[in-house]
């Protein structure tokens, strides 16, 4: 019998194939854009989901399921998360003969046996597919699997070496060679996570290091190494290791001074003190189409939108403008951190910043991640159940802390970015 395919059936097949194709990797860069395997632009509008604290398990699971957290993100239109981890997690795996520790151990070591046991019970209740023997990386895998189901992209970010709150000039994690920032372990950790996460289809990018900064309590290290020449040297080492472990990964490079500017990486200027000039050939086999830059801004007390726009452009977004004569290398540039208090006087003070970013980021068509999708942390800066005033979620993660911000500023920012 001869079969005929109706137009409606054919259309249905096409739609089904398109849906099944998400996220349609591998990804690459093309000029100022990240593109998928069909050369379609991939723009990211998302939130930071921290997993780099003392427990080294992504936050909030004592209050919500993984599905619930990601559904809330997706529910307001976001399509991405910046998922953070600490190098110490990988160090512990190597110290344990290559085996990750289970979340029972992680919570007890991070919170103490009594509180760790209590919090773990809540995590298991909200996430019944887990057991006490589930490992930390299996939690990350579950997040990645749910991201795939909900079509949420992942930027995997090495946030800090030592599992704890970040960041400060005296925390030992500032710069390569600081007391807690072992370069060889950092390279090893990036490669390990790249190899592990290459099985996550939703992973688009991998960030090498969050907020390189001046070691303010280590003058010897600062004077010897805190400069663009060394940042470039170390970023090449980290990028090579990640690329070797996962050749499909787009690699995200950050800048100096808490990653507030990356200008020397795209301007063609000579980096101090040794005079290097950024060269894609220094990233052999991937420099042409696997590199992205990232910047941060926390100028949330400013009263001038033109000033904020000027700083963002000249410290990073300029690299997306191929017609700018001061741009030697065109890159996609992501704003991977920005944020402010979600209510009270500090929120009111940040209104210029908030409204300016809500307009400027869509205008620039820049990918971005707000800081931060939390309510209470497992622990932060020695305080268990720390309630972050900057967190987007209510203390118990039950809803948004400031619906007016979400509706008036964030949703239009999301929609405009992803248009």
Label every PLM stretch briefly.
Residues 85-92, 144, 149, 153-173:
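Aromatic-lined carbohydrate-binding surfaces of glycoside hydrolases
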Residues 60-64, 130, 134, 138, ...:
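Soluble non-cytosolic domains of exported or imported proteins
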Residues 177-178, 184-205, 209-367, 375, ...:
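Extracellular glycoside hydrolase catalytic/binding regions
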